């Protein structure tokens, strides 16, 4: 988990503000507080609030119980909150390039070093009018398990054509449209 890059960006921006007033940023997160991804974000908020005392603080207004997970980006765009922590897949209609993030095997540190974060930020600004600061828990991969030995095509790529996969709304289009798998949603 590479949170230091995002923390450094926020703290650098905060330090550039006038010293006379503490800036308070409001934030929401897409998932319940008990989920590991949200816990990473909340740990980040704690560190910013500790290190930014007197300069910048982040006030978390809640998760999907406060603002629906699919409405959070619009809440940032309209100024209801200042930040949202959520997967790019949740605003796929406005940002189809998010598939590069979903399929990436790079960490956030590597993406920042090679200019990837800057490019993603430019696209966010152009298409959505928002600044993209980075992502948490980078390097987390998606794993597929199967009872039967998988098949590979002539190029050595995994063939999942016709295989039934448990899915969810975040990955279903990728599984069906790109991989050709059959998706079954389970609670």
What does each of the following model-derived ranges do?
Residues 8-9, 19:
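Cleavable N-terminal signal peptides
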Residues 53-56, 72-86, 180-182:
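Alpha-to-beta junction loops
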Residues 26-43, 63-68:
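Extracytoplasmic "Venus flytrap"
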Residues 15-21:
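Sec/Tat signal peptide C-region and signal peptidase I cleavage site
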Residues 45-46, 82, 87-186:
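Contiguous mixed-secondary-structure segments that line small-molecule binding/active-site clefts
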Residues 1-7:
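Bacterial N-terminal signal peptides that target proteins for export
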Residues 61-74, 168-170, 181-187:
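Short helix-initiation/N-cap motifs at beta->coil->alpha
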Residues 34-59, 170-174:
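Short, polar/charged alpha-helical segment
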């Amino acid at each position: 988990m590479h949170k230091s890059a995002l923390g450094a960006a926020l703290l650098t921006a905060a330090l550039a503000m006038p010293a006379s007033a503490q800036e308070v940023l409001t934030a929401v997160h897409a998932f319940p507080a008990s989920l590991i991804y949200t816990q990473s974000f909340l740990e980040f908020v704690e560190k910013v609030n500790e290190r930014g005392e007197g300069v910048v603080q982040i006030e978390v207004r809640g998760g999907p119980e406060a603002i629906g997970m699919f409405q959070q980006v619009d809440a940032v765009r309209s100024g209801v909150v200042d930040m949202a922590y959520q997967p790019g897949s949740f605003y796929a209609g406005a940002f189809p390039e998010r598939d590069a993030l979903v399929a990436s095997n790079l960490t956030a540190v590597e993406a920042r070093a090679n200019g990837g974060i800057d490019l993603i930020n430019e696209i966010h600004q152009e298409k959505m009018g928002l600044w993209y600061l980075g992502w948490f828990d980078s390097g987390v991969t998606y794993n597929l398990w199967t009872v039967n030995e998988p098949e590979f095509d002539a190029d050595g790529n995994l063939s999942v054509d016709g295989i039934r996969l448990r899915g969810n709304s975040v990955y279903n289009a990728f599984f069906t449209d790109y991989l050709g798998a059959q998706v079954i949603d389970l609670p």
